[in-house]
């Protein structure tokens, strides 16, 4: 089995025509199913600049059933945050604001499995995910390990146990899932090679799965559609492309007694956290996190005891810019230009500045 799909958005990478491209490839490949993590703000931009592609994608997305649905939204967070460098409240708001915006464009969206192409993981996720209605997760990120990855543990399924004891059925980065030889940014599950599948089978994994959530960048080399390609000699056959929920519910062993007591030490960050720019970004984000939460508390007191107006738009915009400042690209490519203008690091200063201003 293989997990394919697309990762990106208007802040990271989402060229004009990307939505129409995905819809076209789905029509051309009826046995191809995908998993997506697209920044939620992208959809309003797509609706305006590519209405035909937008509507074609919406028609394909509408079927959210486990058996016949072809698209699963696996990371609905507002800005695909790494989580392990921010607060628990920020993690909650990433999901709350992201899911709310996605459902404006896709009211039938069902959020079943959490998965990410980047190392967007933290120890408290089982509780947060379950509170938002998720049933499953995966801790694989085999093709984008520059920012880090989680510990290798277990077999086909594990119960990811958070610090509060919450359990979530999860496809882990298998104990046998080593880094790709000669690479520090890929694991061997990035492509369903015969060696990878046989290694899994030999360790008792009955239904092994590989994964690559491709960059949403069809005009920049990511334009082949199904990741494994047409040359079946290059990978293990038969291989079926699945949504995560279809794989876990209908193809995997389904349940497990293997409890993985996941701690923050299982998040193996690969960023240069000691650099000055990282320290500055982390400080700016933390100041803004504290400011917006403090402002919400005071606004609640003012509402309850003084009957003052609840400033919904001001608070929401403060959270929006804070969530964007936690985008993984702010941390992994801080000196790259964002949309050809300021760098990501400079934009974090702007975004957190709005949050701080709105918190006063």
What are these regions (language model features)?
Residues 1-360:
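Catalytic-domain carbohydrate-binding cleft regions of carbohydrate-active enzymes
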């Amino acid at each position: 089995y293989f997990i394919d799909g697309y990762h990106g958005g208007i802040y990271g990478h989402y060229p004009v025509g990307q939505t129409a491209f995905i819809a076209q490839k789905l029509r051309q490949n009826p046995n191809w199913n995908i998993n997506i993590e697209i920044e939620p703000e992208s959809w309003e931009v797509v609706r305006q600049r590519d209405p035909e592609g937008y509507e074609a994608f919406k028609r394909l997305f509408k079927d959210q059933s486990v058996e016949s649905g072809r698209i699963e939204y696996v990371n609905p967070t507002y800005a695909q945050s790494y989580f392990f460098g921010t607060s628990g409240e920020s993690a909650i708001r990433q999901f709350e604001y992201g899911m709310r915006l996605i459902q404006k464009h896709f009211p039938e969206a069902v959020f079943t499995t959490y998965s990410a192409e980047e190392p967007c993981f933290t120890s408290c996720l089982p509780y947060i995910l379950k509170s938002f209605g998720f049933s499953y997760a995966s801790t694989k990120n085999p093709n984008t390990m520059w920012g880090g990855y989680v510990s290798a543990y277990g077999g086909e399924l594990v119960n990811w146990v958070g610090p509060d004891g919450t359990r979530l059925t999860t496809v882990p980065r298998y104990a046998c899932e080593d880094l790709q030889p000669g690479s520090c940014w890929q694991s061997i599950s990035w492509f369903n090679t015969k060696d990878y599948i046989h290694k899994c089978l030999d360790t008792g994994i009955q239904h092994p799965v590989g994964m690559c959530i491709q960059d949403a960048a069809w005009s920049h080399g990511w334009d082949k559609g199904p990741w494994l390609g047409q040359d079946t000699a290059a990978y293990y056959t038969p291989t079926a492309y699945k949504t995560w929920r279809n794989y876990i519910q209908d193809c995997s062993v389904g349940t497990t007694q293997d409890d993985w007591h996941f701690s923050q030490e299982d998040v193996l960050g690969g960023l240069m956290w000691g650099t000055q720019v990282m320290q500055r970004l982390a400080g700016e984000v933390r100041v803004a996190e504290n400011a917006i939460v403090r402002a919400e508390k005071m606004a609640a007191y003012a509402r309850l005891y003084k009957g003052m107006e609840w400033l919904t738009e001001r608070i929401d915009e403060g959270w929006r810019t804070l969530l964007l400042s936690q985008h993984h690209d702010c941390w992994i490519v801080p000196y790259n230009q964002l949309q050809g203008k300021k760098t990501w690091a400079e934009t974090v200063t702007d975004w957190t500045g709005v949050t701080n201003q709105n918190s006063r």
